[in-house]
Amino acid sequence: MKYIKLLAGLVLATVLFLFPPSAQAASSSSITRSAGEELTAKDYSGQNLVGYEFTNVVLEKTNFSNADFRGGVFNGSQLEGVNMHGVDFSDGIAYLTQFQDADLTDAIFTNAMMLRSVFNHVDITGADFTDAILDGVEIKKLCAKAAGVNSRTGVDTRESLGCR
């Protein structure tokens, strides 16, 4: 009996070695939207973008106003002059992303992870950053200009950032 188990194990190992099962995991390119593209002046306003990913893209003057972008991802992207007024970016990720001259008014960033992202010359009036994770330097910059209350959540922008 001992030899039969050993022989069965050896046969199984040989079969797996000679005929390995194929990998079924998705590659990152199959789940990324618009990787490496330049998306200047595109209009995504009011659209359902739940779970969309933008990786290494230039989004100049792109309109995301009032879009449902929950769980979305910006990774290594440049958002210059974008309109994100009223966007819902709850549970989203913005990593190594540059927000430059962006309209983030009345946007919802609750539970968003926005580490190593930079916010230069942005308007965050009425934006809700409740439980969002941002770098300390960026929080200080945003607190210097934070004002208003989000029209949908009723949360004060300064309070959501933890400004003193």
Q: What spans do the regions from the language model cover?
A:
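Tandem repeat scaffolds
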Residues: 2-8, 13-14, 21-164
